Amino acid sequence: MRPLVLLWGCLVLPGYEALKGPKEISGFEGDTVSLRCTYVEKMKEHRKYWCRQGGILVSRCGDIVYANQDQEVTRGRMSIRDSPQELSMTVIMRDLTLKDSGKYWCGIDRLGRDESFEVTLIVFPGKRDNAVPAGTCCPSSPTPSFQPLTPTRSLQPKAKAWQTQLPEPRSSRPVVWLPLTTPQDSRAVASSVSKPSVSIPMVRMMAPVLILLSLLLAAGLIAFGSHMLRWRKKAWLATETQKNEKVYLETSLPGNGWTTEDSTIDLAVTPECLRNLNPSAVPSPETQNLSQSTEEEEAARSLDDDKEDVMAPPPLQMSAEELAFSEFISV
């Protein structure tokens, strides 16, 4: 958690007073304005630039003008000069137009995050009035005399106002009219004063968010990959187990000479009976076992009888004379 906080601070928080300058400058159409941005000693060797802020959602620089040490660069109506001895750079804008109004950046180019300072330019419509034309001389006039101000108070039904009447000055000096400040202008000036001296561009604010999103995405991909690997390993182990069980069953089957009790065939039955035997007339296994035991007993008895017949002595063979003599004796 601590490295993420440090990363956020490095990306978002700008350098402390590394670059200073005016927050706002103004002028009329056709005028020339200049401003001066100062920087610290360690920024002396870096390249300086002046650009206009652009973009809608993400701030970016446009119309950038770069300047190196002791170099003055002019592009169009803008010029920038870097003075490392004074630790400052000067920006001049000529022939102002209403389109020049907007926000600009006075920045220092360096590796990683740039140091920048936001400046607001306000261009008033119309040209500045010159009371004294060029090439003319004003006649000398006596010291003007002024009358003291006499405030007059006028009451209205629902409001009170103090009105001050200014006497006409008895002088031939030209009159310079200052631009009137409306409530909107006063609010704009107040808001510009209340703004901090250092502004954070949208890119710097979005960079930590993008980095965190990328880290979360990478962590999710790693977790998903590990889950898939475990699932594939389990599936492979299950397949191998099934194969091993199948091989064991095939090797443990009985041989050709092995017969079960249910598969015993009664040898005493003739082939004709087997051919004429209907499937419905096939005896049950218990009946087959009983008939088989009875037939085995009968076969054993017949074998005993055969043995006795073999062991009995053969009959005596007598000749014809002996037979006749025996017949004679018996009579």
Swiss-Prot record:
It is a single-pass type I membrane protein. CDD domains: IgV_pIgR_like (cd05716). Expressed in monocyte cell lines. Expressed in certain types of endothelial and myeloid lineage cells. Expressed in mesenteric lymph nodes (LNs), spleen, thymus, lung, heart and kidney. Expressed in high endothelial venules (HEVs) in peripheral and mesenteric LNs (at protein level). Highly expressed in heart. Slightly expressed in spleen and thymus. Isoform 5 is expressed preferentially in heart. Isoform 1 is expressed predominantly in kidney and liver. SMART domains: IG. Residues 19-204 are extracellular. GO terms for biological process: immune system process; immunoglobulin transcytosis in epithelial cells. Residues 278-293 have a biased composition (Polar residues). Ig-like V-type domain mediates binding to lymphocyte. SUPFAM superfamilies: Immunoglobulin. Disulfide bonds join C37-C106. Residues 19-120 form the Ig-like V-type domain. The keyword Transport does not apply. InterPro entries: CD300_family_receptors (IPR050671), Ig-like_dom (IPR007110), Ig-like_dom_sf (IPR036179), Ig-like_fold (IPR013783), Ig_sub (IPR003599), Ig_V-set (IPR013106). The gene is Cd300lg. Residues 226-331 are cytoplasmic. Receptor which may mediate L-selectin-dependent lymphocyte rollings. Binds SELL in a calcium dependent manner. Binds lymphocyte. The keyword Disulfide bond applies. Residues 278-318 are annotated as: Disordered. The lineage of its organism: Eukaryota, Metazoa, Chordata, Craniata, Vertebrata. Residues 1-18 form the signal peptide. This is CMRF35-like molecule 9. Keywords: Cell membrane, Disulfide bond, Endosome, Glycoprotein, Immunity, Immunoglobulin domain, Membrane, Receptor, Signal, Transmembrane, Transmembrane helix. The chain crosses the membrane at residues 205-225. Glycans are attached at T136, S140, T143, S145, T150, T152, S154, T164, T181, T182, S186. O-glycosylated with sialylated oligosaccharides. PANTHER family: CMRF35-LIKE MOLECULE 9, POLYMERIC-IMMUNOGLOBULIN RECEPTOR. It comes from Mus musculus (Mouse). It is found in: Apical cell membrane; Basolateral cell membrane; Endosome, Multivesicular body membrane. Pfam families: V-set (PF07686).
